[in-house]
């Protein structure tokens, strides 16, 4: 394939934008090539500025569960634009989407809309601190919760891709309030809680870790966190920015039947437009300004375009059999890629939860950040480039999740498996 215009645009972008991109992982650094510049997308396909067509498993990093440019969502957003893009004032649309989220997500009794997942997690932690009167938070190595200062300690996603566990610019005074445990290891959590008795405001966790690849929770892990938080008066926060409305309509908490105190959301609930949300028990959420003293605000929070896209997306997700069909497609492609690797004699460790999946370039099981970090990232980089040349667009990092959309056809999935088989044989 020819990528000459993308290469030219990347050179231009680096003169005006730090690193040439507006989010680090997009730079393709860890896969040893220049990024694609995208012109348009439709359904399961994405098209670059050189006219190349790709089957897309990035899906804008998760939001595009319906595929790109779903006609019903596009029509609704176009209609909303005619009424105004943003008012900085309440609208009925905010109530509609809030009520849909409350009905869907078991833990949410009240919800506040924001404009990004980072805002959601940052605000949820502030609220948990205000509710408990405690300063410390506990997170897990390899779990990414956005780029607010206190959460950039041993983070996943882009931070993992670039091998930077702690970002310069984060004061030590911030970091000292952040405790880090091992994902899927209750013993490490119990130890930290015991050492910091009555000091921890919240435990924040991705119930399905999606920012070090796709790492499911081990049996009893989420249940153990729930019990511990109840016993110790700690607010349990599920970061479902990625898994919310993705692994089930009610998110991972519905799938695993574990209810946190608070939940953060994003991605899918905005239908491809900038959005975030955090919600939980009324007794906690009522402490938010203006009803309480914990401050949070945003110019574009609850803007009518994102609310409209979210409402239409959630309506479509309620279609009978939607998640069963999506699960079938996801199982088909994930197991097909795993079989292709096995047939080629190339060792991978395959994981999947709903329509999130990952092919770890590892001979051993992956269940936490240490085991994920041991993967052969150089082999993955070669695999990524081979797949790209076959018209398959994957996330440009071993430490990211692949997403299946309802728009992926059986033909798309078969082409993906065939491309993987060819790539593994080359490796």
Swiss-Prot record:
EC category: isomerase
Main subcellular localisation: cytoplasm
Reactions mediated catalytically: (S)-4-amino-5-oxopentanoate = 5-aminolevulinate
Keywords, alphabetical: Cytoplasm, Isomerase, Porphyrin biosynthesis, Pyridoxal phosphate
SUPFAM superfamilies: PLP-dependent transferases
GO molecular function: glutamate-1-semialdehyde 2,1-aminomutase activity; pyridoxal phosphate binding; transaminase activity
Needed co-factor(s): pyridoxal 5'-phosphate
Subcellular location field: Cytoplasm
Record-listed E.C. numbers: 5.4.3.8
Entry annotated with the keyword Endoplasmic reticulum: no
NCBIfam families membership: hemL, PRK00062.1
Subunit structure: Homodimer.
UniProt protein name: Glutamate-1-semialdehyde 2,1-aminomutase
């Amino acid at each position: 394939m020819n990528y000459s215009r993308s290469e030219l645009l990347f050179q231009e972008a680096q003169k005006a934008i730090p690193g040439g991109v507006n989010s680090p992982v997009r730079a393709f650094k860890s896969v040893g090539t220049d990024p694609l510049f995208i012109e348009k997308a439709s359904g399961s396909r994405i098209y670059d500025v050189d006219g190349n067509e790709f089957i897309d498993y990035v899906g804008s990093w998760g939001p595009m569960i319906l595929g790109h440019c779903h006609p019903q969502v596009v029509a609704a957003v176009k209609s909303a634009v005619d009424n105004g893009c943003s008012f900085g004032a309440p609208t009925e649309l905010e109530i509609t989407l809030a009520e849909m989220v409350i009905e869907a997500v078991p833990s949410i009794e009240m919800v506040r809309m924001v404009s990004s997942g980072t805002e959601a997690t940052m605000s949820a932690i502030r609220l948990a601190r205000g509710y408990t009167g405690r300063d410390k938070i506990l997170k897990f190595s390899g779990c990414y919760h956005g780029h607010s200062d206190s959460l950039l300690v041993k983070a996943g996603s882009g931070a993992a891709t670039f091998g930077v566990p702690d970002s310069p610019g984060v004061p030590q005074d911030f970091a000292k309030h952040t405790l880090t445990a091992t994902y899927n290891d209750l013993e490490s959590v119990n130890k930290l809680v015991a050492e910091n008795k009555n000091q921890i405001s919240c435990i924040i966790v991705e119930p399905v870790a999606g920012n070090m690849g796709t790492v499911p929770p081990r049996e009893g892990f989420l249940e153990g966190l729930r019990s511990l938080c109840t016993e110790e008066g700690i607010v349990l926060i599920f970061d479902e920015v990625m898994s919310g409305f993705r692994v089930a309509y009610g998110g991972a908490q519905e799938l695993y039947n574990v209810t946190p105190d608070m939940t953060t959301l994003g991605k899918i609930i905005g239908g491809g437009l900038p959005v975030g949300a955090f919600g939980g028990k009324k007794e906690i959420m009522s402490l938010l300004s203006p009803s309480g003293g914990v401050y949070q605000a945003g110019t574009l929070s609850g803007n009518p375009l994102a609310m409209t896209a979210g409402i239409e997306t959630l309506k479509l997700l309620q279609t009978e059999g939607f998640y069963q069909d999506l699960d079938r497609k996801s199982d088909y492609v994930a197991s097909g890629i795993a079989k292709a690797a096995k047939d080629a004699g190339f060792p991978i460790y395959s994981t999947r939860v709903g329509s999130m999946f990952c092919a770890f370039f590892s001979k051993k099981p992956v269940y936490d950040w240490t085991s994920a970090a041991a993967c052969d990232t150089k082999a993955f980089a070669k695999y990524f480039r081979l797949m790209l040349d076959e018209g398959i667009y994957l996330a440009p990092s071993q430490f990211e999740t692949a997403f299946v959309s309802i728009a992926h056809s059986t033909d798309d999935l078969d082409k993906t498996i065939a491309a993987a088989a060819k790539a593994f044989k080359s490796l």
